[in-house]
Amino acid sequence: MAEPALLPAAQMERLAPGPLASPCPRIPRARIARRCAQRWADLGCSSGPSSGRMDQLPQKNLLRLHPAGSAGCSTGVESSSMDGFWMEVEQIQQRDELREEDSGGNEGQLPEEGEAESQWLQDTGLSGLLGGLGLDGDHQELLSTLTQTQVAAVCRRLDIYARSVRRQHKTPVRDVRDVFGVFNSGKMSSENGDSGMKGAQLSSGASKFPPAAEPGGLQEQAGREEAFNMDSAYSEQAAVLLQRSRPSRGGTSAWGKCSLPKFTVPKGRLGVTRIGDLSLQDMRKVPSLALIELTALCDILGLDLKRSKAGKWKAAETRLFGVPLDSLLEADHKVLPSTQVPLVLQALLSCLEKRGLDMEGILRVPGSQARVKGLEQKLERDFYAGLFSWDEVHHNDASDLLKRFIRKLPTPLLTAEYLPAFAVVPNIPNLKQRLQVLHLLILILPEPNRNALKALLEFLRKVVAREQHNKMTLRNVSTVMAPNLFLHQGRPPKLPKGKEKQLAEGAAEVVQIMVHYQDLLWTVASFLVAQVRKLNDSSSRRPQLCDAGLKTWLRRMHADRDKAGDGLEATPKVAKIQVVWPIKDPLKVPLTPSTKVAHVLRQFTEHLSPGSKGQEDSEDMDSLLLHHRSMESANILLYEVGGNINEHRLDPDAYLLDLYRANPHGEWVLKQNPT
């Protein structure tokens, strides 16, 4: 990622270190956990009744996290303790003036029956299917790209929505109590009624939380390299796995640095596509496709991922803290048009990288509450004016500012709609399937949230890389940062009694997986890129629907797709590469099965710098010119433009012949890297 672009400081303000604020009275961690048992139930997604004995939250003598050694696994005490999580919750409650009963409007509430399915169809671009309106061109194009499991997920949502509509319009049957009245017995209703209601609440609460993945199994996989297949849809892989064998009862815990296996994405003939390699027009199609695939995958895994409602937020009077990410970026674009991450977040991360990476306990040790509040006010007043100086900001204060910035966002960084989906990931028994669900969730996130999250995760990975100096293991970092990502605005979560430890560990595990596997998670799966190509190809052709039946139309589309591979045109022997700069003539490259994108880039570099020594009298001028051209050619990339893709930055290991067959009507263009 490019270095953060910070605002120039017009004047340097000296920040005199103030006296440390007197510590607040410590709150017993067991009491914090009980207070946290009021709001996290909304983060659990129902998939079945919980089973097995739940570990009780430690009431006394909680073990403190201690720095682990520079090598090897975390100790048993460290791997079983969540003390860092509850210490962070305690500090949040001490520093932020929380209102325990304030639920923030309707944020976190689950939609009513049928409403979730209606919203899902709108998010996936299939809202026209509601009410039997039929299929227009856009719906035809999208449905033609779906796999069988994805089509089944769409049909399932349509059926649920149709049933809810019929139920709403059905005339209710008259209750016999409306005719003859109700026998009133206060004593009976108070004794039996209350107990029955409590029993119903307990049973429904227990069914909301699926059995968590049990530890064990990963230690045997430690150090083993395993392939992470992105060529076929995850839901199709899960369906095949479900047919071949029974799902494993014991899960795989991701805790411990040594217990995380290494997953590698096999590079196919078309290469690997990262987030950012696709144009904005193509990338806008990915979230809806990823949402359909996520729903199909969760249907097969037996997870009910209900989308929560986004709460209403009041417009903040501040300019930095408590401001939506898109509003921050809108203001930042006036200063730096190319920025994709809020400048204040970049500045905070840059300050911590320069001053805090090697400091012991970074992110865990709190700063001065008085200084942090003063720094927040100075940032609000002086940041955009370029008058704020980071030179004397203590690294612990900067750490608190970073976490405070994340917590005070009007909506969670992981979004209010899909925060429950992130929280349910640890309940998936198989680690690879957890990664698949997380991968799709990352692709669904709005672009500002995804970019800000990536900047944060890159910084956290740098902290873990300096573990020998700062004594912060991957587990330490995850337990400290999890409350700031999952406790929106620092509010204690609601969850059933006895579930605190389970969900706290789950939240920290999600952060750990995102930090460790972020390169994999920020990849656009090959099957999604193929669906984008088909969607663009269908959009350009705009086939007319002759039969109104959905199944008939899908059958015809699949038949046409099978016939399309029989009439391939003759493959040219030479590929013409358009060059935007610095030459105008196209570059001719032999199109063979072994020609890679890297060969084109190497040939272009040799074309700019042929390596001739030249005459001695112009040696200095030629050497400077060749050096300049070599520097420029190092930033040259090959793009695929037109055809069934708008613009696609190609992987150097991709093969040209396979790219031509995937997009015969596209062009290849050499351009400078925009960054």
Curated annotation (Swiss-Prot):
Gene3D superfamilies attached to this UniProt entry: Rho GTPase activation protein (1.10.555.10)
Keyword annotations of the record: GTPase activation
One of the GO biological process terms: regulation of small GTPase mediated signal transduction
Classification via InterPro entries: Rho_GTPase_activation_prot, RhoGAP_dom
Superkingdom of this protein's organism: Eukaryota
Domain Rho-GAP: 323-522
PANTHER family the record matches: RHO GTPASE ACTIVATING PROTEIN 18,19-RELATED, RHO GTPASE-ACTIVATING PROTEIN 40
Name recorded for this polypeptide: Rho GTPase-activating protein 40
Native source species: Homo sapiens
Biological classification of the source: Eukaryota, Metazoa, Chordata, Craniata, Vertebrata
